Amino acid sequence: MSAAPRIGILGAGGRMGRTLIQAVQQAGYQLAAAVERPESSLVGTDAGELAGIGSVGVKVSGSLADVLKDCDVIIDFTAPAATAQHLKLCREAGVAMVIGTTGMSDEQKAELDEAATHIPVVYAANYSVGVNVSIKLLELAAKVFGDTVDIEVIEAHHRHKVDAPSGTALMMGEAIADTLGRNLKEVAVYGREGHTGPRDRQTIGFETIRGGDIVGEHTVMFIGEGERVEVTHKATNRMNFAAGAVRAAAWVVGREARKYDMKDVLGLNDVQV
């Protein structure tokens, strides 16, 4: 698409929503809509004022249905139940979506997959370029080490995050498990307590830390005899996630209807490991 995409932001009043508004403006794209819950006191507020960048002439709406006609693509970092409703509306309107909502159930993910047969959808647990490059490195490490190491995933986030492990940690685990030919649901171990017995090398361990204002940190350890390789990504602010999501939004407009991920956006699926 040659013209600047018209982008709508859902959950505009949240931390991520405000950062997304800033990212759209920084990228030089058109902020076409900003949406909050209909009962929110922020409805009617200028979206730019809300995001701390001055007036942009776009008022926060309380209805996605009312603004879809003005948008080429919607960015959704809200909550699973809300995202499910947004998917239905965007599917009916033929509007592309970029979804960063985490904690979705298997049923909700199936609904997303179905919607993606009608509209183009980018779905990723993390839109940071650095995280997605890290995942490519994890695939390489898993391929080289194979079954010769123990694998642990450690993640840390702020005290307000409500799901655990993080979607990014699970995305990393999935990438490793797929590379090794394992089913993550069968081999994942979430935390340990009491007499656990010897570690099964086929398992992939997950540990979660919650506290303070940690934006997001992920470390994957490949632990062998006499050496350990660690791949770590640390986010210091939310702008890297927002900038990646806006990049995905510009990329997905005009694409064929299917589900994409951030590796598609970055061309990483074409990089062989």
UniProtKB/Swiss-Prot annotation:
Subcellular location: Cytoplasm
Keyword annotations from UniProtKB, A to Z: Amino-acid biosynthesis, Cytoplasm, Diaminopimelate biosynthesis, Lysine biosynthesis, NAD, NADP, Oxidoreductase
E.C. numbers: 1.17.1.8
Binding site for NAD(+): G11, A12, G13, G14, R15, M16, E36, G100, T101, T102, A124, A125, N126, Y127
Catalysed reaction equations from the record: (S)-2,3,4,5-tetrahydrodipicolinate + NAD(+) + H2O = (2S,4S)-4-hydroxy-2,3,4,5-tetrahydrodipicolinate + NADH + H(+); (S)-2,3,4,5-tetrahydrodipicolinate + NADP(+) + H2O = (2S,4S)-4-hydroxy-2,3,4,5-tetrahydrodipicolinate + NADPH + H(+)
GO molecular function: 4-hydroxy-tetrahydrodipicolinate reductase; NAD binding; NADP binding; oxidoreductase activity, acting on CH or CH2 groups, NAD or NADP as acceptor
Any GO BP annotation: lysine biosynthetic process via diaminopimelate
Residues the entry annotates as binding NADP(+): R37
Source domain of life: Bacteria
Record-stated family: Belongs to the DapB family.
Name this polypeptide is given: 4-hydroxy-tetrahydrodipicolinate reductase
